[in-house]
Design a protein with these regions (language model features):
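DNA polymerase processivity clamps
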Residues: 2-109
Length: 109
C-alpha cells in the first residue's frame, strides 16, 4: 500500500474547524453545494462540481491530504488563496495554471 509512504502531520486543536471553514469557502466560491460527513475516525469536507474539486481528509491522530484543485475566476482564486495560506504546509506546492489553483492544505507538526 502506498498509504504508509504518505507524510503524516499532527493536527493541532481547532485545525479541523479551520480546514472545514476553508473548504466551505472554496465550495462557496465554486458556487457548489458542500457536503460534510463525519465518523469517529475521519472528517471529510468536499465541494465538487464541473468547475473542479476541493477535498480534505484526515483522521484523528495524523493527517494525510490529497491535492486540492479548483477552477474559478482570478479574483476568487485570490480570495481562496488568502483564506488558506496559513494552512498550506508547503508554499512551493501552490500552483496556478490559468484559472486552476492547486495546493496542499496541512500544518507543520
Amino acid at each position: 500500500s502506498q498509504a504508509t509512504n504518505k507524510p503524516k502531520f499532527k493536527i493541532p486543536e481547532g485545525f479541523a474547524n479551520a480546514v472545514a471553514k476553508v473548504s466551505l469557502v472554496i465550495a462557496k466560491e465554486l458556487q457548489k453545494d458542500c457536503v460534510l460527513t463525519t465518523n469517529r475516525e475521519e472528517f471529510v469536507v468536499s465541494g465538487t462540481g464541473g468547475l473542479g474539486t476541493a477535498e480534505t481528509k484526515f483522521d484523528t491522530d495524523h493527517m494525510t491530504l490529497s491535492k486540492v484543485s479548483v477552477i474559478c475566476s482570478p479574483e476568487h482564486l485570490t480570495k481562496v488563496l488568502a483564506d488558506v495560506t496559513h494552512l498550506i504546509v508547503d508554499k512551493n506546492s501552490v500552483q496556478m495554471h490559468g484559472e486552476r489553483l492547486t495546493y496542499y492544505v496541512a500544518t507543520r507538526g
